[in-house]
Amino acid sequence: MIFGTPNSTFLENRLGSSTGMPFSSATSLNSGVDQMMNELNIQQPTSHTVLFDLSWEVAKKVGGIYTVLKTKAPVTVEEYKSRYALIGPYNASTAPTEFEPLIPGPLSSPIIENMMKKYGIHVHFGKWLVEGYPKVFLIDLHSSMHKLGEWRWDLMSGFEQAGDNETNETIVFGYQSALLLKEFAEANPNDKYIAHFHEWQASVGLILLKKWKVPVSTIFTTHATLLGRYLAAGGVDLYNQMQVLNMDFEASKRGIYHRHWIEKKSAADSHVFTTVSEITGYESEHILMRKPDVILPNGLKLDKFTALHEFQNLHAKYKGVLNEFVRGHFYGHYSDFDLDNTLYVFTAGRHEYFNKGVDMFLDSLAGLNKLLQQSGSKMTVVAFIIMPAATNNFNVESLKGHSYLKDMRRTCNTIVEAMGERLFEATSRGKMISPEELLSQEDLVMLKRRIFALKQKSSGPPVVTHNMINDNDEILQHIRRIKLFNSQEDRVKVIYHPEFLTSTNPLIPLDYTEFVRGCHLGIFPSYYEPFGMTPAECCASGCPSITSNLTGFANYMSRALQDTDSKGIFIVDRRFKSSRETVDQMTQYLWKFTQLDRRQRIELRNATEKLSELLDWRTLGKFYKTARALALERAFPPKPISRSPSPSPSSSLKLSTGLSNQIELQQQQQQQQPQPIGTTINLIPPSSNVSVTPTTTPTTTTTATTATTAPITTPKPNVIPINTGKENITLLSPNSMSSLLSDSLNEFKKQQQQQQQSKTPTTPTTTSTTTTTPSTTAAATNKSVLSNPTPTPSPNTSSFIPTNKGSTATTTTTTATPTPTPSNNTNGKPFNPIEALTKSNSSSNFATTSTASVNTNNGGTNSPVSKSIPIPSSKSLK
């Protein structure tokens, strides 16, 4: 796994640390990525590299992926220019404001025409109306809905859900996008294509590209696993039970196995699998059965947040708007509200009561209220909850209070203007005017009426600003349970605003970014948060925040900073502490924050705002570059190094796995300095697959066997052990690694000689025989049984329920064209830089024999159900 540097310790420690590998600044983070890319020697994009981003949210705002693609677009367009485009479904309702049609160029025009002529698929070409104006291909789903039944059966026959409209549209879009990419690859065979699929709704096309053997390198990013979100929302202790749950069975119980299968299969089939955080990577390891190759943290477009020296002035400006809201909401109910001793805290996001940690947020507010009351503090804390829920209108009491306040302000402005005229008239005549003459009787009457109206509020300050349709809303029920009703003696006031903020809001006329700048503290103790854009936006706005160690943002920042508290990022422990302990920890954070004076809060805001560079796409975009380069390396490996066979019998064996290349590489590096700590993980795995090829006849036979090397138990003087809490990670110097590789080579030669002497081949775990002729054609039969196969659904049931009885299905053998087979890292093995180097030197001109094996054993899964999906002909798709 790659995250800043290849040596990632967070997953090995199983989420137990809140202070990971330190980076002093964004500069060190960048240099770590650059150094890693240089060491891996992976391919960089050229003028013949074309990049596509595929998502359900291209030019259509649905969730957070829209923000990721939108803010990342300027940086990607700057890098790829016209060689970058996005692919998404066409939406007639959002297209007028998000999409501008363009005339296709000479490259795209024939492809779009072929899509209509061959398959009847209508593709809209144009530009996305966001900064950078990237080109987009929006595909009309309705033009292929008549093929839904055929495609659905072809993809997942036996366990499909015909009534799932979202999945039906996902399947149609998947086939359409795969056919579009296939047309590009066939029309321009000299170009190298990278297709980056975001989330399972867009990834059916990835599965099809793999089945059809289309020469396109693929990346799959899960921003949150589908089943993980279901389990967390259902109250399952996800991170403690993840290792014992049968994920396929859990998905079947919830009626989402067909969706889960798409996500799991996409992770297995992609050349590079990525997630947005290490916590999601740990989750994917158990739910999708594959560790991520690269971590891609979400970034922000900092131009939107940049304020430099003005950010404190902006805080004062937008805090003034919040002060105006507080006056209208609370004034008239009680008169001891001191705005100079008032702090504004908030939480925001989707209405997910448990996943977003709203329960702990409210419990900590109740604890803070007691502490402030017991200490006799004059500080008032106003806590906002900005989460959308079903409403039918604004609360009448809220509107009345703001209406009275606006009327009061207009009256005061009128009186002040009249007083100014009187004062000017008197002084211009050389007369002094008494205070009684400044304020007329009419003015006094008007003021008394306004004050009387303001005090005629029938009830206390409302907790909710709108009329809720669901009176049993979980947030409302919790507020009633802790009895925070905004009474006068409460030092903590709660404002539940069940609607996203806009500048046209009659109560709080601020955009969300402006609202964040006006607040003092953001609180996001989420239980399930793959990354967490809300605390990231707080950081970019100079607003300190509280988050949990189960969020991707906390993972990222704890690795980048040695002391997060001093930078305004407070991380509570939801992994190893009980709920009560976590609430107490958060209450203490809030209590300490209320004890800061104004100067200390300003210094904390300054420290937080300086971290924004860590979240800039120009910093985080390098992780995307790494993922793309790695995908190119696996999909299009370089040509092998040609070497002449030696006449000596003892040296006439060539290691086709690239082990000899490793030795040669290490010999070249012996004169160089040893590598620094943190550049290599598991250089010598416990087992290796080695192919030995005799060079005696023109026709060569390659036999793959499984050999095991002895584990390294005692480090040599030049071997540095690193304790990660899960396994030892050893960093080897070039001399020691060359020695170990030579020992491995001798061991393999010894085994080969023993096999030749006994003339009885040893039965390996998995044996495959490939005969290569000078014409590079091959025919072979390969039968294998997966150790942890994916449950095969019964064709007689619409909702698949895995069973505990195993039965092996028919094994299918197909002969592929001379195409390199990339390593997908589906066995959960961590990223190996040396392995990547040797793969880059392996031969790409050979015929392969592909074997698919399906076993219905419920003992676990290593890869999703493998189904043969033929390339549909143009005739069948018309």
Curated annotation (Swiss-Prot):
Q: Which organism is it from?
A: Dictyostelium discoideum
Task: Tell me which UniProt keywords the record has, alphabetically.
Answer: Glycogen biosynthesis, Glycosyltransferase, Transferase
Question: What is its biological role?
Answer: Catalyzes the formation of apha-1,4 glycosidic bonds adding glucose residue from UDPG to the growing chain of glycogen.
Q: Which Gene3D superfamilies match?
A: 6.10.260.10, Glycogen Phosphorylase B (3.40.50.2000)
Q: Which sites bind UDP-alpha-D-glucose?
A: 61
User: What top-level class of enzyme does the UniProt entry assign?
Assistant: transferase
Explain the activity's dependence on pH: Optimum pH is between 7.5 and 8.0.
Q: Which SUPFAM superfamilies match?
A: UDP-Glycosyltransferase/glycogen phosphorylase
Q: What is its EC number?
A: 2.4.1.11
From the Swiss-Prot or TrEMBL record, give the protein name: Glycogen [starch] synthase
What GO CC annotations are associated with the protein? cytoplasm
Q: Which family does it belong to?
A: Belongs to the glycosyltransferase 3 family.
Q: Which reaction does it catalyse?
A: [(1->4)-alpha-D-glucosyl](n) + UDP-alpha-D-glucose = [(1->4)-alpha-D-glucosyl](n+1) + UDP + H(+)
